[in-house]
Amino acid sequence: MVWFVYGEECNVEAQDVDLCACGCWLNDRLLAFYMAWLQHRCRAPVLCLGPATTFWIALADVDTLRGGLSRLEMADKELLILPINNNPYGDRPGGTHWSLLVCHVPTKTFHSLDSAAPMNEECARNVAHKMAQLLRWREGEGEVEVHPVSCPQQKNGADCGVFVLLYA
């Protein structure tokens, strides 16, 4: 049974709502729903990407991404908001932590908000590197600087998704 529907591809079911109970992890569908809602509220010049898109950015090659993401016109935005997960697998569920990466397009800078810093540092840097290439700020290899933002830290192993919603 679908409880909430937002847009054509974003819905939340009863089993997802149950995850909002204390001590449970938020799943991809809840984060996607919130990012879609936030995108609707923010409008341009902010682009809130969902977990699936960010995961694809982390795993795919830049040429494939350019073709698939060109319609988003990311270079024309002011802020890009990306939820980051540390799942290293492209073919199955996984991952144990969410954080948030914010790209400020006018200054070509990346900022990471991690409630269990520096747990997702490498994952955020990987996505930032791909984003810099997608936005044509740099080509090839080379370090992309991601500025860690001082932010509240979680006190348990389950609240990272809630913190991502808060930071976004």
Language-model features: locations:
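Cysteine protease catalytic domains with a Cys-His-Asp triad
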Residues: M1-S99, C103-F110
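Cysteine protease-like catalytic core of ubiquitin/ubiquitin-like
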Residues: D63-A168
